[in-house]
UniProtKB/Swiss-Prot annotation:
It is found in: Cytoplasm. Cleaves peptides in various proteins in a process that requires ATP hydrolysis. Has a chymotrypsin-like activity. Plays a major role in the degradation of misfolded proteins. The gene is clpP2. Fourteen ClpP subunits assemble into 2 heptameric rings which stack back to back to give a disk-like structure with a central cavity, resembling the structure of eukaryotic proteasomes. This is ATP-dependent Clp protease proteolytic subunit 2. One of its GO terms (molecular function) is serine-type endopeptidase activity.
Length: 193
């Protein structure tokens, strides 16, 4: 069951009901709380573009609790975060895994955070192929290319040498908030506002 809370606000014109995500958007907060697919990416990208149009100078905050998902969908979010004028802060709540961790690291340097009991997980891209040998070869080359591209971006975002990223993403690599801070995925652990 997908229950979305409603928030009632009092205004000088009476009461106004919002779903919680719309109300958070008014405060420039975007929630990424699911696996990342094309629909989720389109929603996040649309919200980023909308908030930029509202005020290109004011920060946007993305709260992340995601197991990851599609690389291409995640890259659409990443590219938009880099493209828009407002700085984007990222906050890990719960778990930022795979593409979720990649997007956590993609926040504005100095504005990437985690709550104390949250976790991050990085690994190499997952994929599979079937069909003729040529099709499998094409898919294998593509996933190797994506692995190198993602590792290079993560190396740039974390300050880790590329060789370290290649080693550390070879298998699932879980990190506490403290380890994510030490690694360079985040810049600070939030304990309160």
């Amino acid at each position: 069951m997908n229950l979305i809370p409603t928030v009632i606000e009092q205004t000088n014109r009476g009461e106004r009901a919002y779903d919680i995500y719309s109300r958070l958007l008014k405060d420039r907060i975007i929630m990424l709380g699911s696996a990342i697919d094309d629909n989720v990416a389109n929603s996040i990208v649309s919200q980023l573009l909308f908030l930029e149009s509202q005020d290109p100078e004011k920060d946007i905050h993305i709260y992340i609790n995601s197991p990851g998902g599609s690389i291409t969908a995640g890259m659409a979010i990443y590219d938009t975060m880099q493209f828009i004028k407002p700085q984007v802060s990222t906050i890990c709540i719960g778990m930022a895994a795979s593409m979720g961790a990649f997007l956590l690291a993609a926040g504005e340097k100095g504005k990437r955070y985690a709550l104390p009991n949250s976790e991050a997980m990085i690994h190499q891209p997952l994929g599979g192929a079937q069909g003729q040998a040529t099709e499998i070869e094409i898919a294998a080359k593509r996933i190797l290319f994506l692995r190198e591209k993602l590792n290079q971006i993560l190396a740039d975002r974390t300050g880790q040498p590329l060789e370290v990223l290649q080693r550390d993403t070879d298998r699932d690599n879980f990190m506490t908030a403290e380890k994510a801070l030490e690694y360079g995925l985040i810049d600070k652990i939030f304990t309160n506002r």
